[in-house]
């Protein structure tokens, strides 16, 4: 079972190599390297710089947890492959902002519906700390700065996503 999101592309060359991977019946699933692009620039660093994601699995060995940003649960051995997926998630900053907002609201709704307990103090502390730490981690420690404007945009907007998740959680727990 090969599955890609609508904004992911597997090259013809990589597609031709899939049967070779499937020959090893001991492996239940494979992680493929995902390379993100923003403004036609390949992101080599930051949060998306070294991303491998399960995109090839035997249908009898996989199930999913969560509806949005689903997490594959694999029964059996998972290995890394050399295959690469190109990921074009955002056409421009406006598209990126809309996506960040939508996913933040979905994530907060998921956490709220799963009945995680979030005391007010925890949400406020995370609101103040987590987005800032995430920016520093992605932009400086993971070298997002080396990706230029695209790296800065990603670091800022993914930190903003972290902020929005907590703002939406605060609204759900304490303002409704």
Language-model segments: residues:
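Catalytic metal- and UDP-sugar-binding loop of GT-A-like glycosyltransferases, i.e.
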Residues: 4-6
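Catalytic-site signature of metal-activated, phosphate-bearing donor transferases
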Residues: 2, 11-175
């Amino acid at each position: 079972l090969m599955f890609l999101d609508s904004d992911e592309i597997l090259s013809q060359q990589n597609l031709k190599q899939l049967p070779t991977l499937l020959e090893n019946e001991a492996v239940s699933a494979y992680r493929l390297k995902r390379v993100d692009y923003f403004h036609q620039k390949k992101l080599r660093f930051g949060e998306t710089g070294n991303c491998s994601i399960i995109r090839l699995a035997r249908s009898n060995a996989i199930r999913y947890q969560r509806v949005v940003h689903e997490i594959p649960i694999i029964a059996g051995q998972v290995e890394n492959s050399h295959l690469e997926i190109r990921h074009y998630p955002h056409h421009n900053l406006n598209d990126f902002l809309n996506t960040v907002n939508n996913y933040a609201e979905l994530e907060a709704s998921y956490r709220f519906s799963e009945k995680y307990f979030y005391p007010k103090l925890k949400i406020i502390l995370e609101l103040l700390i987590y987005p800032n730490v995430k920016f520093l981690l992605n932009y400086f420690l993971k070298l997002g700065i080396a990706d230029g404007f695209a790296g800065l945009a990603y670091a800022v907007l993914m930190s903003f996503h972290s902020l929005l998740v907590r703002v939406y959680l605060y609204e759900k727990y304490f303002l409704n």
